[in-house]
Each structure stands twice: as structure tokens, then as C-alpha cells.
UniProtKB/Swiss-Prot annotation:
Subcellular location as annotated: Cytoplasm
Molecular-function GO term, any one: tRNA binding
Descriptive protein name: Alanine--tRNA ligase
Gene designation per UniProt: alaS
EC number: 6.1.1.7
Domain notes: Consists of three domains; the N-terminal catalytic domain, the editing domain and the C-terminal C-Ala domain. The editing domain removes incorrectly charged amino acids, while the C-Ala domain, along with tRNA(Ala), serves as a bridge to cooperatively bring together the editing and aminoacylation centers thus stimulating deacylation of misacylated tRNAs.
Similarity comment: Belongs to the class-II aminoacyl-tRNA synthetase family.
GO cellular component: cytosol
Protein's job: Catalyzes the attachment of alanine to tRNA(Ala) in a two-step reaction: alanine is first activated by ATP to form Ala-AMP and then transferred to the acceptor end of tRNA(Ala). Also edits incorrectly charged Ser-tRNA(Ala) and Gly-tRNA(Ala) via its editing domain.
EC class (word): ligase
Transmembrane residue ranges: none
Length: 872
């Protein structure tokens, strides 16, 4: 077996499959594009679903890739096991209706065992297969595999809901008896026992059925086109080929671990407690790649995952004695390890380091707050005479403050307290159940549509015309091809068309189809790409249509021009964002409609009003500069040399279209555009908002809509000016400010009067002191306007030694407000109010010295006051 670096393994994999006629699919962005079922790209096949379900027909049905992936369903196992990772690389080879079982197995065996390639010893390889899949068993035998090395497994059948499914065959490497101390042998495989002896290195999925949950597996229908989907973990291959005990001792992780050794002054011990080293090395890889791909730490979705990973890594750094920010210093090492195939980490290093460091600094402040929270919890336990920290409190520390359970346990035990592990597990399960319920159900490849996939007739979109005559090539009605149609809705394909099919954020054209008499025979309501790329017109049929007949196709010209204004303005906006807030502000989605444009982009904070003003000004400057817009067709490399921005998630063919707006903007784009930027007329941003962690959205209007937006603002300003009696519009702001200042003065004066009134009333309230259990208590109903007045009473009470405990109740509107304040350690205000609040049908809580509650039953106020003495 050859000893290869991870880069050599990856390259040899791709080279082998290229030699078998496969095209190399570049690794896609970790953030899925147009797939709401996935939080992250989590496998090599995840980006190829459109090929497998037939919605897009690939030029080459044989594909290979090395795909960066993230899975976060078992973060807690990372660092504990030899092979769990959050980010990993999946090597794959795929066949879309081309070769099948025989070639997949034969070529796979050749790659693994041939001296020209990986040169694995044959006697170290074991294969599992689905018991009913005798074809795979026989093919392995034909390759020279001993029957004793073939293990039937009932679970070797791949399916996720409806869609492509089939048996799979897995390949394992036997690391020998040293990794099997109990000498269990092949039972480890047959009974699926977790072990370190037989390492799964490759899985070959043989997709030959369309799974249907409504019928038994034996009744699944055969796919029109059978597919091959395989996955081999690079980290596992590297561990085997480099003789490493775990994945972490390979060249993918050890350089990071060495840097952590330098930062911590500790030494990594392969056989000792090395979990913190592993966690840090794994998590910084995921953070570096995910942030480089546009995901940013936040409080939900992908952002929450990244924040959790970063905080977990930071806490493990502290366990190694690293108390300052340090993770950002590891980004360079990650980039250097992966540079040969993933140069983007080094290219975006400054931005990634900035985000990681800023998040570390924020978390440092959070840790201080969390430590304070833990100290408060432990002090409360001491005051209450309890010896166990509750699971819900441990979970809050873990979930809100990012404290690993081990750290909480360590600190609590140092202080002499036990840990409620079961309560923590229960709280964790509740959160996981909520998360699962919120996930969009999906994952299936979807059923293949043979009718659409079977359209092979050529069709060409004509950019520079609004009307043309063309022959009708295909009619599909009720999901079947037909020669004619006279009513209902149908899908049409023409030899050529002026109708733009929805793509790249630009909506489809609408319009009409006319016969040779000039009569409208169909209304075009939508246009989408067919699997083989033809524009597929969805039409409402008004009169007879037949294949082979020529028709006149006319788009709605006014609508197209309005869409083009917004699309061209989107390109200007993208460039302006780069100039004003930074090149990290890359497109994360767009929509160019007739009435408005919507642009989503990566950014870690809200765009300030000043920045929005600069962006809007810059876009309008380019409009007024009347920049010529040109389009060029060329290859991708030439386009990039021209400075064209290629968007993540977009797949480009051999020939691409470059849209250039003067010297200001150059982008790869297949959409339609104006001839000159001046045709946009005017650009106005109407909204900027966050739509998820690390993603912002700008909604803007152009032309007539922009003018109307400005006019609406002017009308509103005129109305304000009239209300405040400003002689001119320019005086309105000063008038409003003067009114605001006057209002603030009145509010201040009113507050002072309230305080004086409260102080006067307090004198009467504080006279009535009772005693219970050696504690002096004041308990009274007061007449106040709001809950703030209760706090004012409490502030006055604190100034003098009126009593040890104060309980105030007020009926304000339909609600009852309760306040408890305590000056003595013997009475916990928060606990006391939890007992009192239910009496008035309320609830609340607070700190040991101050707590408040709200209720709804004012008839029970007297009962509450009577119960005060008993609750002390």
C-alpha cells in the first residue's frame, strides 16, 4: 500500500476517474444554493441532486468530485472518537444513467488494489452487501475477492423517502488484531459493532429503484436510468494510508495540533487525554471553510452552528491553558494544509481571521457573564442548603453561555456540588426535539420525470428580439407528449424563442403566441428550463396548437424592460457593496422582478444608514454616467481574467456570458440587460434587513417606482411639516427636534413630580410594619399609574431602615403588579414572589434582593397580602 499525503490521495482519486471518462465537478460552496432541505452541503452527492432526479441533464453522465462537507448532528462526539468530524471531504464517483454495478465495483477494486494507484493489499479488504443483491456478491467474487471477505448486511439498502434508492456495498480496511483486543473478528462487521479494526473507507450505492413509501420494497419500480453514487472519506483514507491510529494523526490535522501545542505549551499525547487538541483542530477547519463560503456566526441556523463550534473550541482552549484569543491564529495553518485544492481559505484569510477574532472577543465577555451566572447559581444553592446543580441550569450555561458540561461539572465539584446529569439530558432532548420539528423535511432526490428528461429537440433563446416566428417542436399536456392541444394548460418547446426562462434571479418573460392570422392562441405565463436546457413555456391554451406549425412569439416588452432595469441595477448594487462595505459582501441570492429588485449578500452586521446612503449615491452616479453595457461570450478562464465575478453555487458551461457595465462592473451572467446604465433612470433603496445569520437583504426600486418612492417620502414630509407648522420643508426637522426637546422636558418634570408624590405616599406606606419569624415586613396595596412607580417606592425604601422585606401590590388597569424587595439574606425575593404570584393568577421571578410579578385576579389582592407573613 502506498503511503500518500492527503493531497496526493485526493488528486490520485480524481485522476483515476478522469481516466475512466469522468468529468471533475469542482467542490461546491458549503452553503446550499436553492435547497431549503439542507443546512449545509453534507455529502458529495448533495450538489448533484438535480442530475439524479433528471431536472437537469448533465453533458457528461460520469462525474467525480472531492466535496467539502459539514455534518453537525453529533458535535459532542468530535474529539471523543477516532473518526468523528464536523467538516470532512467526501471523494465520490457518480454515474447518471451510464455505467452501473459491474463497472462501479470493478473500477473501485482497481483503484484500491492496482500498484499503479492506491495498491491496497487485497487480503486487508472486506466488503458488505445487501443479502438479496447477489449481483454485487458475484461481481466481487469475479474481481478476486475471497467469499470469506464478503459479509451480508440487511441494512445495506439506501433510501430516503420517495426517489432513487437501491442496495449498497461498503468497503472496509482491516487494521488487524491489534485493534481487536477481544478478538471478535468479523462479528464486528456482521453485527455492526463499533470498532477500530474494520474501517469503512468507501460506500457504493447502486440506485436502481424509485422508492415509494406507499408500497413494499419488493414492488419498487426500476428507474428509467440507473445511477451510481459513491462516497469515500478522505480523512479515513489518509489515516489508513499514512498508518495513523486516528484521523487526527494525519497530515490534515497534525499541523494544526502542532500550532495548538505552541500556543498552549502542552504536548499532544496520542494515547492520553487529547480531546481538546482534537476539538480545536476539527472545529477551526469547519469555521475557516464555512466563513470563507459566506456563513457567519449568529443565533440561528448555520450561524448558531458556527457560534457553537467556536465557543466549544474556545472552552477547550481554556482547558489547555489558552485564555487569550487564539483560534484566529490557526486559520493560516488550515489554509496552508488545504491550499492545493481549496485556495479560497488563504485568499479570504484576512476576512476569516477578522470574523473569528471578533467572535472570540465577544465570547470572552460572554464567558465572564457565564462565570458570574454560575457563581450566582452556586451561591443560591448554598443559601438554600442544596447540594445539586439542576439540569435546567446546566443546560442554560451550556446553551446560552457556551459552557461545556465538563467545565460546569469541574467548577461545581470544586465548589462541593453534584451535577444533575439526567436533568441536563432531558433539557437537551427537549431542544433537539424542537429542532427536529423545525427542520424542513427533505433529503430525497425526487422522482425522475421521464417525459421532461426525454425532450431532446433543440431550442435556442434569442437575446436581442422581443418577437419572432418559430416552429413548435414539442407539446406536453397532462405529463404526456402530444401532437396537438386545444384547451387547458400545456408545456411548449419551440425551435427558437424570445422568451427568457427564469434563471439567475431574473423572472421569466410573459407574453403571447399568435397564429398566422394574427390571433392569440396561447398566453405564456411562465418559462423554465427543461432538464436538457430547452426553454419550456407554460401556456394557457386559447385555440388549437399543433407540432410542426409556425407561430409568432411575442414577449411583454414593457415588462421585460422593467425587469432589465432592476437586473442591471442589481449588478451596480453588487459592485457598490464591494466598494462601500467590503469584498466579502458576495451575492447570496437575488430576485429581479418587474416592480422591484431584491439582493441578498453576506455581511456580519446591519448596513448603517450612512453606508446605505453611500451605496445609493454610488449606484446613481453610475446611472448618471451613462455607462455602455456590453456582453461577451467566452470561456470561464478568460472571463475571470477580464475581472468577472463568478458567483458561488452557479455552474458555468464551456462558454459563458460576460456582462460589463463600463469599467465599473464585470459579472458572469446569462440574463438580459439594458444597453446603457442611464436607461435605469433612478435607483432607490427602500429596505435593508437581516434574513438570517450573516446574511443581509436590500430591497430597491428603479425608474418610475424609484420616483414614486421619493414622492411618497416628500408627501409624508409635507404632512409632518404642516403638523408642526414649519414654514418650509427644510425647517421641519428643526421643528420636530424642538417639540421632542419640549416633550423630554415635560416628561422629566412629570417624573420628578411622580417621585415627590411617591415619596410623600411612601411615608404613609412605610409606617405599617409587621413582624413574622423575626423578620420586619411592610406589605401594602398602593395606588400607582404604572409598575415603574413600584420600583420608585422600593428605591425610597432602600434608603432607610424601614423594614427587612417590602411587598407592594397595585391594580393597574386589568392587571395586578406585585413587587418584593429584601434586605436580608434570610429572605429570597425571587423565591417569595413565586409563592405569592399564583394567588392573583400570576407568575414572576427575580433576584434575591428584588423580584416582580404580574397577575390578573385583583379580587385576591387582600388574600395575597394576608399570605405574606407565611411565605417569609
Amino acid at each position: 500500500m502506498k503511503e500518500l499525503s492527503s493531497a496526493q490521495i485526493r488528486q490520485m482519486w480524481l485522476d483515476f476517474w478522469k481516466s475512466k471518462g469522468h468529468c471533475v465537478e469542482p467542490s461546491a460552496n458549503l452553503v446550499p444554493v436553492n435547497d431549503p432541505t439542507l443546512l449545509w452541503i453534507n455529502s458529495g452527492v448533495a450538489t448533484l441532486k438535480k442530475y439524479f432526479d433528471g431536472s437537469v441533464i448533465t453533458e457528461n453522465p460520469r462525474i467525480t468530485n472531492a466535496q467539502k462537507s459539514i455534518r453537525t448532528n453529533d458535535i459532542e462526539n468530535v474529539g471523543k472518537t477516532a473518526r468523528h468530524h464536523t467538516m470532512f471531504e467526501m471523494l465520490g464517483n457518480f454515474s447518471i444513467g451510464d455505467y452501473f454495478r459491474d463497472e462501479a465495483i470493478e473500477w473501485g477494486f482497481e483503484l484500491l488494489t492496482s500498484p499503479e494507484w492506491f495498491d491496497f493489499p487485497k487480503d486487508k479488504l472486506y466488503m458488505t452487501y445487501y443479502p438479496d443483491d447477489k449481483d454485487s456478491y458475484n461481481r466481487w467474487i469475479a474481481c478476486g475477492v475471497e467469499p470469506s471477505h464478503l459479509v451480508p448486511i440487511e441494512d445495506n439498502f439506501w433510501e430516503i423517502g420517495a426517489g432513487p434508492s437501491g442496495p449498497d456495498t461498503e468497503i472496509f480496511f482491516d487494521r488487524g488484531e491489534d485493534f481487536d483486543p477481544e478478538n471478535i473478528g468479523l462479528r464486528l462487521l456482521a453485527e455492526d459493532i463499533e470498532n477500530d479494526r474494520y474501517i469503512e473507507i468507501w460506500n457504493i450505492v447502486l440506485s436502481q429503484f424509485n422508492a415509494d413509501p406507499a408500497v413494499p420494497r419488493s414492488e419498487y419500480k426500476e428507474l428509467p436510468n440507473k445511477n451510481i453514487d459513491t462516497g469515500a472519506g478522505l480523512e479515513r483514507l489518509a489515516a489508513v494510508m499514512q498508518g495513523a491510529k486516528t484521523n487526527f494523526e494525519t497530515d490534515l490535522f497534525m499541523p494544526i495540533i502542532r500550532e495548538v501545542e505552541k500556543l498552549s505549551g502542552k504536548t499532544y499525547d496520542p494515547d492520553g487525554d487529547n480531546m481538546s487538541f482534537k476539538v480545536i483542530a476539527d472545529h477551526i477547519r469547519a469555521l475557516s471553510f464555512a466563513i470563507g463560503d459566506g456563513a457567519l456566526p449568529g443565533n440561528e441556523g448555520r450561524g448558531y452552528v458556527l457560534r457553537r463550534l467556536l465557543r466549544r473550541a474556545v472552552m477547550h482552549g481554556r482547558r489547555l491553558g489558552i485564555n487569550e484569543t487564539f483560534l484566529y491564529k490557526l486559520v493560516l495553518t488550515v489554509g496552508q494544509i488545504m491550499e492545493s485544492y481549496y485556495p479560497e481559505v488563504l485568499e479570504k484569510r484576512d476576512f476569516i481571521e477578522k470574523i473569528v477574532k471578533r467572535e472570540e472577543e465577544t465570547f470572552a465577555r460572554t464567558i465572564d457573564a457565564g462565570s458570574g451566572h454560575l457563581d450566582s447559581l452556586l451561591a443560591q444553592l448554598k443559601a438554600e442548603g442544596k447540594d445539586t446543580l439542576e439540569g435546567k441550569d446546566i443546560f442554560k450555561l451550556y446553551d446560552t453561555y457556551g459552557f461545556p458540561v465538563e467545565l460546569t461539572e469541574e467548577l461545581a465539584e470544586d465548589a462541593g456540588y453534584k451535577i444533575d446529569h439526567e436533568g441536563f439530558k432531558s433539557a437537551m432532548k427537549e431542544q433537539q426535539d424542537r429542532a427536529r420539528a423545525a427542520v424542513v423535511k427533505g433529503g430525497s432526490m425526487g422522482m425522475q420525470n421521464e417525459t421532461l428528461a426525454g425532450i431532446v429537440e433543440e431550442s435556442r433563446f434569442e437575446y436581442d428580439t422581443y418577437s419572432l416566428e418559430s416552429s413548435l417542436s414539442v407539446i406536453i399536456a397532462d405529463n404526456e407528449r402530444t401532437e396537438a392541444v386545444s384547451e387547458g394548460q400545456a408545456l411548449l418547446v419551440f425551435a427558437q424563442t424570445p422568451f427568457y426562462a427564469e434563471m439567475g434571479g431574473q423572472v421569466a418573460d410573459t407574453g403571447r403566441i399568435k397564429n398566422d392570422k394574427g390571433d392569440t392562441v396561447a398566453e405564456v405565463v411562465d418559462v423554465q428550463k427543461a432538464p436538457n436546457g430547452q426553454p419550456l413555456h407554460t401556456v394557457n391554451v386559447l385555440a388549437s396548437l399543433s407540432v410542426g406549425t409556425n407561430y409568432t412569439l411575442e414577449i411583454n416588452k414593457e415588462r421585460r424592460l422593467a425587469v432589465e432595469k432592476n437586473h442591471t441595477a442589481t449588478h451596480l448594487l453588487h459592485a457598490a457593496l464591494h466598494n462601500v462595505i467590503g469584498e466579502h459582501a458576495t451575492q447570496a441570492g437575488s430576485l429581479n422582478e418587474e416592480e422591484f429588485l431584491r439582493f441578498d449578500f453576506t455581511h456580519f452586521e446591519a448596513v448603517s444608514n450612512e453606508e446605505l446612503r453611500h451605496i445609493e449615491q454610488e449606484v446613481n452616479e453610475q446611472i448618471w454616467n451613462a455607462l455602455t453595457i456590453t456582453t461577451t461570450e467566452t470561456d470561464v478562464e478568460t472571463a475571470k481574467e477580464m475581472g468577472a465575478m463568478a458567483l458561488f453555487g452557479e455552474k458555468y458551461g464551456k462558454v459563458v456570458r460576460v456582462v460589463q457595465i463600463g469599467n465599473y462592473s464585470v459579472e458572469l451572467c446569462g440574463g438580459t440587460h439594458l444597453n446603457n446604465s442611464s436607461e435605469i433612470g433612478l435607483f432607490k433603496i427602500v429596505k435593508e434587513e437581516g434574513i438570517g445569520s450573516g446574511t443581509r437583504r436590500i430591497i430597491a426600486v428603479t425608474g418610475r417606482q424609484a420616483f414614486e418612492a421619493y414622492r411618497n417620502q416628500e408627501d409624508a414630509l409635507k404632512e409632518i411639516a404642516a403638523t408642526v407648522k414649519a414654514p418650509q420643508l427644510k425647517d421641519a426637522a428643526a421643528k420636530v427636534q424642538a417639540l421632542s426637546d419640549s416633550l423630554r422636558d415635560f416628561q422629566k418634570e412629570n417624573a420628578e413630580l411622580k417621585e415627590k408624590a411617591a415619596a410623600a405616599a411612601a411615608g404613609d406606606v412605610f409606617k405599617d410594619v409587621q413582624e413574622a419569624k423575626g423578620v420586619r415586613i411592610i406589605a401594602s396595596q398602593v395606588d400607582v399609574a404604572d409598575a415603574g412607580a413600584l420600583r420608585t417606592f422600593a428605591d425610597n425604601w432602600k434608603q432607610k431602615d424601614y423594614s427587612d422585606v417590602l411587598v407592594l401590590v397595585a391594580a393597574i388597569g386589568e392587571k395586578v403588579n406585585v413587587l418584593v424587595a429584601s434586605k436580608t439574606k434570610d429572605v429570597h425575593a425571587g423565591n417569595m414572589i413565586k409563592e405569592l404570584a399564583p394567588i392573583v393568577a400570576g407568575r414572576g421571578g427575580g433576584k434575591p434582593d428584588m423580584a416582580m410579578a404580574g397577575g390578573s385576579d385583583a379580587s385576591k389582592i387582600a388574600e395575597l397580602l394576608a399570605a405574606v407573613a407565611e411565605t417569609v
